[in-house]
Amino acid sequence: YPVAETDHVLLLENERDGIKKYMKKLQEETKMTEENGMENKESDEIGAIVANCNPFTKGHRYLVEYAASRCRYLHLFILSEEQEFISSDARFHMVSEGVKDLKNVILHRTSDYLISPVVFPTYFMKEKDQAFTMNCMLDIEIFRRYIAKNLGITKRFVGSEPNCQVTNEYNRCLKEYLPQSGIEVEEIKRLEIDDMPVSASDVRRAYEGSRMEDVKRWVPETTYQYLSECKK
């Protein structure tokens, strides 16, 4: 069953109306927050962030807090793909604990529809750079056509990425193409601690090397508590 297509890529799924069911779930999650009257009344923007949070760092918290302060509601999508360091469910719980004081933030899982192996199957293609750009366009088409349209999203926030060429290219595609659909993209300079950008990969390396003091400097207390428990 077709989900979305660009000039070069067609995404199919094996479940009829799978994307429609996902949209319904997002709308139900949104309605729960809206009914509680938790909006930021100082803004008319509806924002979105898509993040991995493996783990949830002070850098992620900085980006979410910044975006939430500038939006009526902020939709925060956490990648659903299972990863080696922290499971999808644990990452979602970690983020939920880390942003629970930000009442206008609405948490969602990405399922297979945003930044997933389904949307970025570049290992099937010989021309990796060209393939990645094609997959970016597919990801943007799904976000624009379904998610932004159904949730009324007007702005997408991304963090700057000084060390990763892949993320830089993804951000470039977002900034080039989303405004064509009336969706503003704002890139926020990454939080620095001791003149170094806060990085989830650095947190993972510190954790695996049992450098828990470094971990504590780079993550919120809620994340640190979770990681400390895992060390026991």
What function would you assign to each model-found segment?
Residues 1-232:
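Nucleotidyltransferase catalytic core that binds NTPs
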